[in-house]
């Protein structure tokens, strides 16, 4: 049994896995929220941790583990040149984020023998190009949908700051009034829809460019907390998989 922890910038996801492909239980919590209830969980043989949220998150994770399972072995996952069938095409492999690395491993296992474009939607939107043979060819990083909207609100004099929940409601209203209207007629709707279309445009352009470059079909795989909203703006085929990082961590743990 392995404890898997994926600490992102917005929240911490975790799972207990008894094999490389099966989660016994899982959950998620915000960085500032109450601790998860691990009191009934069996003792794992160790914890495998991907943390891109910094030192404060690392200290909290250590404290949570120590409170429930003192002295439990912990492995902080870092990207390497090759692991679990994936080779790292980064110029400096160790500089690739651990979440992106684990996600690549999870995606390669889930969609074996397929070329992939993996789009993950969190605080940042990341795109990873993964060949069918497991070679990570490179990626793109852009502000996430929420960060785009928040940045416009913070760094302009007259634009509002719109949250994801508010933007989703605004887009629902826009769709109900005219599902085919390409442009909004007020600022909050325009900001919400514009930032959403920017996300969709990035993804669709990258997907088309990758299929052209590789001269082969590429599966577009979507993951992350903001995927529900962004899916509505996409016009290309796609597949959802919301546990890529945890799946990759499970594979890393069971290969140790």
UniProtKB/Swiss-Prot annotation:
Substrate binds at residues 90, 97-100, 187. Pfam families: Pan_kinase. Its main location: cytoplasm. It catalyses: (R)-pantothenate + ATP = (R)-4'-phosphopantothenate + ADP + H(+). InterPro entries: ATPase_NBD (IPR043129), Type_III_PanK (IPR004619). Signal peptide: none annotated. Pathway: Cofactor biosynthesis; coenzyme A biosynthesis; CoA from (R)-pantothenate: step 1/5. A monovalent cation. Ammonium or potassium. Coiled coil: none annotated. It is found in: Cytoplasm. Its EC number is 2.7.1.33. One of its GO terms (cellular component) is cytoplasm. Keywords: ATP-binding, Coenzyme A biosynthesis, Cytoplasm, Kinase, Nucleotide-binding, Potassium, Transferase. Its cofactor is NH4(+); K(+). Catalyzes the phosphorylation of pantothenate (Pan), the first step in CoA biosynthesis. Homodimer. This is Type III pantothenate kinase. It comes from Burkholderia mallei (strain ATCC 23344). The gene is coaX.
């Amino acid at each position: 049994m392995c404890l898997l922890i994926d600490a992102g910038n917005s929240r911490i996801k975790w799972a207990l896995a008894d094999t490389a492909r099966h989660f016994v239980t899982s959950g998620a919590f915000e960085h500032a929220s109450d601790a998860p209830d691990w009191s009934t969980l069996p003792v794992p043989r160790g914890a495998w941790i991907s943390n891109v949220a910094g030192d404060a998150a690392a200290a909290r994770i250590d404290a949570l583990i120590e409170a429930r399972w003192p002295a439990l072995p912990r492995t902080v996952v870092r990207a390497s040149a090759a692991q679990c069938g994936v080779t790292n095409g980064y110029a400096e492999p160790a500089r690739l984020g651990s979440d992106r690395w684990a996600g690549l491993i999870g995606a390669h296992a889930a969609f074996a023998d397929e070329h992939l474009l993996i789009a993950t939607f969190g605080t940042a939107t990341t795109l990873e190009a993964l060949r069918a043979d497991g070679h990570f060819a490179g990626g793109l990083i852009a502000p996430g949908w929420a960060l785009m909207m928040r940045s416009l609100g913070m760094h302009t004099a007259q634009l509002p700051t719109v949250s994801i929940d508010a933007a989703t409601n605004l887009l629902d209203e826009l769709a109900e009034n005219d599902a085919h209207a390409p442009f909004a007629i007020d600022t909050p709707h325009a900001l919400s829809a514009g930032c959403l279309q920017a996300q969709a445009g990035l993804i669709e352009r990258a997907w088309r460019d990758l299929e052209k470059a590789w001269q082969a079909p590429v599966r577009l795989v979507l993951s992350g907390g903001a995927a529900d909203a962004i899916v509505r703006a996409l016009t290309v085929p796609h597949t959802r998989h919301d546990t890529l990082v945890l799946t990759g961590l499970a594979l890393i743990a069971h290969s140790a």
